[in-house]
Structures are given as C-alpha cells and as structure tokens.
Regions:
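Carbohydrate-active catalytic/glycan-binding domains of CAZyme proteins
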Residues: 3-360
Length: 360
C-alpha cells in the first residue's frame, strides 16, 4: 500500500531546496514516479550548471523513498553513451523520463523525449531504455518517431488529402490555426512518423499502457497504445484536443474518468494550467479550463511551475498529488519542485495554493 503523506505536510511552502540523504538538492527534473516493492522511485533529468545544463550531459537520475519525504540517491539510472555513434550522447536533449513496470516481461521500461545533439528541437523523437531493476542501470534501445504511415483512429478520411501546404501560410494566422487543427502537421509527418516532445506514460486498469506526447509541433497531443511488452507501439493512436497547444502532460484516472493536467506553450516560463477529462483513455477529451485557484499571478503561472506527473497517493486512484517543476533555465541545476494536492469540484480537478508542497 503506497504511503499516504500526512495532510499537514501539504499545508503550504516549506522552503526551496529539497535535499537527499547526502544533503544535496534532488536532481530529477521533469520527473515521474514509479511505485514498486513498497518503494517510490523518482526519475528525472539530471541537470548541470548554467544554461548548458539544460542539455543531457549526464543522464537520468533516480532516487528512492519509503515515504515521499526522505529520498536516497540511487545514482544515474540511464547514462549518456560513450559510443560516439550512439544517438544518446552527452550534449543531446533528454527530457521527461517516465518508467513503468511490465508484469509479463518483468522489465522496467523507460520512455523519454529525445532530441539529437546539436539539432535543437528538430528531431522530436521518443527514446526507449529497459532494465531488470527499478533503479537501473537502464540499457538504451532506440529512439524513433512513432506510427509512420499510420493515420490516427479519430482522423477523418476527408482530412487525409493535402489541400494547403505550410509554406503557403503565415504562422499564427487564422488560416494557419485552422490548417493545424485539421491536421496539417500530422499530414506533413505521416511518412516519417509523428513528433514526440513533452510526454507521459499511463497504465490502465487492464494493464494496457499508453504513451502521450505533445506532437504536431506541440499543437496537438497524441495518445498512443503500447505493445504488450510496453517497448513498441501497436499503431493505434488518437489526436487529443487538436490545436489545443498543450505541454507538460500529467494523466491519471479517478472514479472511472480520465483526467489530464497540462500547460500552455511559453518555453521555460510558467503559464496558466489546463485540464481535461474523458470517459475512456482513447476517447473524446473535453477541455475543463485552468485548474488553479489562487491569486491572479498564481493562476496565471500555475504557482510558478509546470506539470509533469500525477502521483497516486493511496494506490486506489482516490488521492493524487501533481508533481511540477519550477525551471531555472539560466542555471538548470537550480530548478525547484512544487507538489500540489489535486482536489475535485465535482468532475473538475482543482489546484489550491494551501495544498502546495515545495520540499523540506
């Protein structure tokens, strides 16, 4: 049974730095959580000093805890390769690593957003690594753009034909917005595979796993079904909230409904949060608006943070905490963490300042 964080520990800010067992600020940004063997494992991006620290110079860091408060440094779970022919080398971009456990293969499966070295954010790939143990080491398998040559399940035949090309449109114009919503970028990337940037993983009650990512130049989310071993894509996927411009997805299930909390597109700067709901993971998603309740500044910045993962606090899908990042792009290693209890007003997820936890 997962540990239940006492309510008093969520009653407001408790400082800035969150120290591990060595007295060092936890270095696991854009992270996610795995609960296995009565232990929480926190995986995240290992940042280094300065602006250059936003690149993957080290790898994915892992920490373990029995109570979500006191964290033990488990080291680097996935290291950058020393093989210069590998795609996963120091200086590339690796963001938002997430890990799930596969009961069939007994493997721990990590997916992450991967950009190639010296190519900015053009590659927009997702990477895969696997391990026999939760804290690693993880073996890098490959990176790809998924579902090449496959249309989404909810994409109409009438939209599959190219009618207008991107070069003919002014980015940001009403014509461009309509083109994007109709699937212009999806059609552009059809042959080579769909883009993957900010991402999340989710295991449903039937043990089927899904990969969600900001796709189509971050204009539209895709939810993609994974194979039984969680190491590939089945080809079944849907477009979610077309042209909704969502990043930082955190997805969870409560009382038979599926929810997500996301952010808008403002780079490293915080912005108003977003939320959405669906009756099924691959079904129609309905936008619910900004879940934040607080001052105008708090609501407009999601308490100066960006969502990354929703922690199931009781193992029953009844109580969740949103993990979020407070980015420091000028000195990446100094990024902070904000955890917010997710309340509900009927079917609407709510984030309140009095339920914010910022570390110890």
């Amino acid at each position: 049974m997962p540990f239940i964080l006492p309510s008093q520990e969520l009653s407001g800010p408790q400082g800035g730095l969150w120290l591990d067992n060595n007295g060092v600020h936890i270095n696991a940004h854009g992270g996610g959580m795995l609960y296995q063997n009565d232990t929480y494992y926190w995986f995240g991006e290992h940042k280094t000093d300065g602006k250059g620290g936003n690149r993957a110079n080290v790898g994915v860091h892992c920490y373990s805890s029995k109570n979500l408060m006191d964290w033990t440094d488990e080291g680097i779970a996935l290291k950058m390769s020393e093989d210069t022919t590998s795609l996963l080398v120091a200086g590339c971009i690796l963001e938002r690593p997430k890990v799930i456990y596969n009961e069939l293969t007994k493997k721990y499966v990590m997916w992450f957003h991967h950009e190639l070295k010296d190519q900015g954010y053009d590659a927009a790939m997702t990477g895969l690594a696997i391990s026999d143990t939760p804290s690693g080491p993880y073996e890098y398998i490959r990176s790809l753009r998924p579902n090449a040559g496959i249309w989404p399940m909810n994409f109409p035949d009438s939209s599959k034909e190219i009618k207008t090309r991107l070069d003919d449109l002014e980015r940001g114009s009403e014509e461009w917005k309509a083109w994007s919503k109709e699937g212009g970028y999806l059609r552009r990337d059809f042959e080579g595979g769909q883009m993957c940037r900010d991402m999340a993983l989710f295991i449903d009650v039937d043990d089927r796993a899904y990969h969600m990512a900001s796709s189509e130049e971050n204009q539209t989310l895709h939810i993609r079904e994974l194979t039984d071993d969680y190491q590939d894509f089945t080809g079944k996927y849907v477009r979610v909230l077309p042209a909704g411009r969502n990043e930082g997805p955190a997805i969870f299930r409560k009382d038979g409904k599926y929810y997500m909390i996301t952010s808008g597109l403002t780079g490293w700067k915080p912005n108003p949060g977003k939320s959405a709901m669906a009756d099924s993971i691959m079904g129609e998603w309905t936008a619910l608006g900004n879940p934040c309740i607080g001052t105008e500044e708090e609501e407009n910045t999601t308490f100066e943070s960006q969502s990354t993962y929703a922690i199931d606090m009781d193992g029953k899908g009844k109580r969740y905490i949103l993990m979020a990042d407070r980015w420091r792009p000028e000195n990446a290693i100094d990024g902070r963490y904000v955890w917010i209890q997710i309340d509900f007003d009927e079917n609407n997820p709510i984030l309140k300042w009095e339920n914010v936890f910022e570390g110890k």
